[in-house]
Amino acid sequence: MNIVVAGTGYVGLVTGACLAEKGFCVTCVDVDEKKVEVMKQGISPIYEPGLDEILDRNYKAGRLDFTTDYESAYQKADVVFIGVGTPEREDGSANLDYVFAVCEQIATNVTRDVVVVLKSTVPIGTNDKVEEFFKENKKQDVRIEIASNPEFLAQGTAVIDTLHASRIVIGVESDWAKDVLTSIYQCYGQPIVVTNRRSAEMIKYASNDFLALKISFINEMANLCEIVGADIEEVANGMSFDPRIGNKLSLIHILTLPTN
């Protein structure tokens, strides 16, 4: 199985490196030639503990490659993971230009049936729009199936978050896409949650929002504890024994998370 990863930022590079670490043959595509040459030396362009070692080990083993030649990469691809950025526009909406630029490259160059997987955080319904884009723009008579596979990583722990994920969410609309992604992720040994694409997109936003809600709540409780002379860690510990609220570790962890 030839896997291609579009984009070598936090999401794309960590995804590609970890797939190679699991034994898959992976080609990471980026438009920046200097960046590609640096990665071929086993040096990550982003700081992430453990990533340099994974890049170096798997590049030398021949499981991981880096290229700017997207035409050749997509022609040989069986699965393409899209992990490019979706920066915020001035009006607050997500800029999907990079996503659709990659889709244009895939549509122009793909020569075989392929599963295209969106790892990037995108608005609800984007996978459906990508599917329509391929129907209208693909150059060859091939099957292109779209899947949503949101990431749940954090900077500084991205490698651990990927290799030891709490769960792997797969949003699909066909048995073929489900079978392909399940066959890839079963070696991770983590729970695989299979949903439709819109549910997978929503799981990403709902998870982020719920965590933000918990952080806001515990911060307010910390402020109140300071006013009344209580100890927030003792309060969190006392709350944690209630199974409806959560365990001690998760509550104390939230106390240490940055608020920005």
Task: Outline where the language-model segments fall.
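Structural/interface elements that position substrates and couple domains in central-metabolism enzymes
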Residues: 1-255
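A short, hydrophobic C-terminal helix/tail in secreted or cell-surface proteins
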Residues: 256-260
